[in-house]
């Protein structure tokens, strides 16, 4: 598997939009699913210049932290297979429920090992940000996500209840 994390750009416009359309269709037909990083849906991709410009929070805003958004690109297949958002800091909400990294694999590419590798690459980015520990969370019923986190060194700290859903909180030492 040869994947890399890339920033959103016009070079990958078609692959990004193709992935977003698949995710939107999936989420409309599976309303119970929360399977994508919210950052990639902050803005409508139809105005792609605006979409790219507002993909990340570069300056702190009330209730939000600076972040970096990456897309996971499989160059052999010329396919965007996932996306992730790395929060540079944790506010109270992220410390309890969201963590440093929000990630997701496009529906047609799940259960192929991409998430484990994508998290490994994200942890390299976290090191570059100067983080020494990273918090990742997932719904307790998302076994695949938990396995990907554990494979990258995640140690379960505890479980917390968020709006009727049990979240597992894992710490990874870098």
What are the residue ranges of the model-derived segments?
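Conserved GNAT acetyl-CoA-binding A-motif
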Residues: 126-137
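GNAT-family acyltransferases
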Residues: 1-100, 164-174
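Conserved catalytic-core motifs of GNAT/GCN5-like acyltransferases
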Residues: 137-138, 150-169
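Conserved acetyl-CoA-binding loop-helix of GNAT-fold acetyltransferases
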Residues: 102-105, 111-124, 128, 147-151
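Conserved beta-strand-loop-alpha-helix junction that forms the acyl-donor binding cleft
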Residues: 136-144
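Short secondary-structure boundary/hinge segments and terminal tails
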Residues: 127, 144, 166-168
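Short coil/turn motifs at secondary-structure junctions
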Residues: 89-91, 108, 141
């Amino acid at each position: 598997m040869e994947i890399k994390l890339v920033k959103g750009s016009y070079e990958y416009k078609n692959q990004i939009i193709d992935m977003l359309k698949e995710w939107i269709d999936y989420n409309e037909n599976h309303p119970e699913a929360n399977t994508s990083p919210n950052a990639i849906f902050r803005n409508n991709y139809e105005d792609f210049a605006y979409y790219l410009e507002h993909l990340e929070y570069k300056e702190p805003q009330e209730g939000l932290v600076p972040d970096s958004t990456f897309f996971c690109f499989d160059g052999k297949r010329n396919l965007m297979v996932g996306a992730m958002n790395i929060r540079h800091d944790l506010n109270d909400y992220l410390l309890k429920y969201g963590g440093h990294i929000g990630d997701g694999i496009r529906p047609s590419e799940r259960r192929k090992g991409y998430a484990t590798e994508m998290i490994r690459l994200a942890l390299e980015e976290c090191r570059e940000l100067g983080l020494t520990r990273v918090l990742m969370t997932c719904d307790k019923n998302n076994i695949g996500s938990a396995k990907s986190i554990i494979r990258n060194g995640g140690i379960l700290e505890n479980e917390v209840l968020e709006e009727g859903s049990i979240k597992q909180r894992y710490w990874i030492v870098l």
